[in-house]
Amino acid sequence: MATTKLVYILLILFTFTVSPAISTAPEHCDSGFDNPCINKAKALPLKIVAIVAILTTSLIGVTSPLFSRYISFLRPDGNGFMIVKCFSSGIILGTGFMHVLPDSFEMLSSKCLSDNPWHKFPFAGFVAMMSGLVTLAIDSITTSLYTGKNSVGPVPDEEYGIDQEKAIHMVGHNHSHGHGVVLATKDDGQLLRYQVIAMVLEVGILFHSVVIGLSLGATNDSCTIKGLIIALCFHHLFEGIGLGGCILQADFTNVKKFLMAFFFTGTTPCGIFLGIALSSIYRDNSPTALITIGLLNACSAGMLIYMALVDLLATEFMGSMLQGSIKLQIKCFTAALLGCAVMSVVAVWA
């Protein structure tokens, strides 16, 4: 997974360094210079406020689940934690459908792009679809590699007296018999799934966090920034809760927990700093910006939608905890709907 994350980061850095002359903007493209809200002097202090506010709310969001072990209502094995996790999963699903994917469609269908090929093919939907499939492949192959790396194949029940359905067999060293077999319960397999889910989810979130930060930092529209600050704070708070819950269940080492929380917390502010540095040469209606950010948004949307539906919501709703209680299912479904509703309301401003 570290290699996969590195590939994604390199891809992002590469796309932002592509030559600004990918294509030429049509003559009828609105430059936006007549907008009275365009004021660089007023926009800069607002961007600084945005950096501090988003940094703070992101930190609160992603770290709050990590301290839930000390709150009886929110312990990982309790109903309260499950309800909060489903709410956060709804937030992530709403982010993909109501924020990232619509932005991608809007950018890649802009009148600032040439008709051929951007208006003749739904690139946003196609890239989101392929991103979801690639995420599925990464999810599946990574799990297989990690599981297969430690598997030695089936062992007869009569030899070990253990139900194979409840154990996977891992190579170990037995001091009494030379090379022996160590058996791990299903909990180990579930822990591996949680770790894969947390890491893939973080990659998807980092994708669109970079885009959000760059766009906010590069714009000089003070009216837009004012509305975005509050909306993005709510967005990062709840998204952080969702990611933090996944990190908690993955039971990473403290160092890995810190690094994942650090990257989530700092990515958007770093994107804003980068946008500020590029604001003098960056035009959000240029073909290069529209194509690059539009494609990155589509890719991020596919990943977030897949993770929310398949690895988060479906996994929990098909699990033994929710399957054993219709009442808890209803509560969790309501929480997921509420999460989607919150992001739908936030979409009015962001």
UniProtKB/Swiss-Prot annotation:
GO terms for cellular component: plasma membrane. One of its GO terms (biological process) is iron ion transport. The chain crosses the membrane at residues 48-68, 81-101, 121-141, 196-216, 228-248, 258-278, 290-310, 330-350. InterPro entries: ZIP, Zn/Fe_permease_fun/pln. It is a multi-pass membrane protein. Residues 22-47, 102-120, 217-227, 279-289 are extracellular. Expressed in the external cell layers of the root subapical zone. Residues 69-80, 142-195, 249-257, 311-329 are cytoplasmic. One of its GO terms (molecular function) is zinc ion transmembrane transporter activity. Pfam families: Zip. Induction: In roots by iron starvation. Belongs to the ZIP transporter (TC 2.A.5) family. High-affinity iron transporter that mediates under iron-deficiency the iron uptake from the rhizosphere across the plasma membrane in the root epidermal layer. Could also be capable of transporting zinc ions. This is Fe(2+) transport protein 2. It comes from Arabidopsis thaliana (Mouse-ear cress). The gene is IRT2.
